Amino acid sequence: MLTLESVTKRFGGLTAVRAVRLEVRRGDLLGIIGPNGAGKTTLFNVIAGYYRPEEGRIVFEGRDVTGLAAHAISRLGLTRTFQIVKPFGNLSVADNVMIGALTRLPRVRDARVEAERVIALCGLGPHAAARARALPIGLRKRLEVARALATRPRLLLLDEVMAGLNPSELTGIIDLVRRVHAEGVTLIVIEHVMAAMMRLAQRIVVLHHGEKVAEGTPEFIAGDRRVVDAYLGEEFVLADA
């Protein structure tokens, strides 16, 4: 479904992503982990068309999308969320989601129906009329996912949707990610909440200093000495034992 061929992104003299190769199959739920500054969000921005790579190629569903603008890639069915959520604060939850739907469904009636479906899926029904700026962080995270889903992606990139959530909110967002995946959406998830990632992901990729240093099942990654030393730490291994 998605292939990255030696993708490299530089900012001046800094190489943020270095020769990353990746293969994502339809139906995958792939996790990406790594320390702060490892290049995870930059990689998302390159995949989704916000940054153009200096080297390498990105192929989505058989089409070379390297260098395409983000809006063009989104229309093809590849969309991302953002770690720092910025909804239209003065608009209602329903209107925020409708804006996403209108990018794929030009008729307002159709967009409204799609928005209602996505709002229900994301558990935002009781808050549909609320202004986005009034939502607590847990609901704003759900709204960010809903806005992306309204564009009808086949591949969705989720950037730290669990960050800053309390245990109850975390449980809810994990359930939401599972529901979205069950709807047939292929997912790539960046996350620092490792206990959740270990339960959710079918496969995990580890980035360190912009390079892919490991890839495998959660069990394999938890036992990889390079990953433990660079990121997870002995405390995680002992807690998971």
Language model segments and positions:
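Glycine-rich phosphate-binding loops of nucleotide-dependent enzymes
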Residues: 1-241
